[in-house]
């Protein structure tokens, strides 16, 4: 059943089917965990070179089977379009000198696709990573298999609500027992996401 916590002097219960904890007019709703355990999935993280979602410049993937991380993959990617914006560089530290000789996305995805076949994908703020994947499929005119995405950001909001100062990846990872020391390295972020998913999904 959903559980409500008053953050502003009011109390409200939304019922067991409510999905998100939100803050409105001083009300912050927190939900108790009712999640089962997702034991088979692929956690994925993209970093981009610029504001275009197709401009993926690195990818990290962690394969989880039976609740155990059994495989991982990381690659730099030659971005499309091929330019870097300063705010992206400031986030992940990558630049054209890092990806000038990197493989293009189709060559990288050819290695990833067999690893994730039949698995749901998990990402933190899945709308971003799913958007990147769909955009780069369009750019290279690749078939989109329509991967099913699960979002650990949404799961954190459901489970922790206002008990956390924020629901950023490093914050949620720490609560779930993972020390994310290389935030915005795609593989480190995918590993953190996998740890969160094992706790919350």
Range-by-range predicted roles:
Residues 19, 23-37:
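Short, Lys/Arg-enriched N-terminal segments with co-localized hydrophobic residues
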Residues 31-147, 162, 166-184:
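Conserved non-catalytic scaffold segment of RNase H-like nuclease domains
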Residues 143-157:
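Conserved beta-strand -> loop -> alpha-helix junction used to position metal-binding or nucleic-acid-contacting
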Residues 185-198:
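Acidic, divalent-metal-coordinating active-site segment for phosphoryl/phosphodiester hydrolysis
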């Amino acid at each position: 059943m959903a559980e409500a916590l008053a953050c502003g002097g009011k109390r409200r219960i939304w019922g067991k089917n409510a999905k998100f904890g939100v803050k409105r007019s001083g009300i912050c709703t927190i939900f108790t965990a009712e999640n089962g355990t997702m034991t088979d999935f692929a956690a994925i993280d993209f970093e981009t070179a610029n504001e275009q979602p197709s401009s993926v410049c690195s990818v990290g993937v962690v394969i989880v089977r039976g609740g155990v991380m059994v495989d991982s993959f990381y690659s730099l990617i030659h971005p499309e379009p091929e330019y870097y914006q300063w705010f992206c560089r400031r986030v992940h530290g990558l630049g054209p000198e890092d990806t000038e000789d990197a493989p293009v996305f189709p060559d990288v995805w050819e290695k990833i696709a067999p690893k994730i076949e039949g698995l749901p994908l998990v990402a933190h703020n899945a709308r971003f990573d799913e958007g990147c994947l769909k955009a780069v499929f369009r750019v290279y005119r690749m078939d989109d298999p329509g991967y099913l995405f699960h979002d650990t950001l949404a799961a954190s909001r459901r489970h922790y609500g206002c008990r956390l100062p924020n629901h950023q990846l490093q914050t949620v990872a720490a609560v779930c027992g993972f020390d994310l020391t290389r935030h915005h390295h795609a593989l480190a972020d995918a590993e953190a996401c996998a740890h969160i998913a094992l706790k919350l999904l």
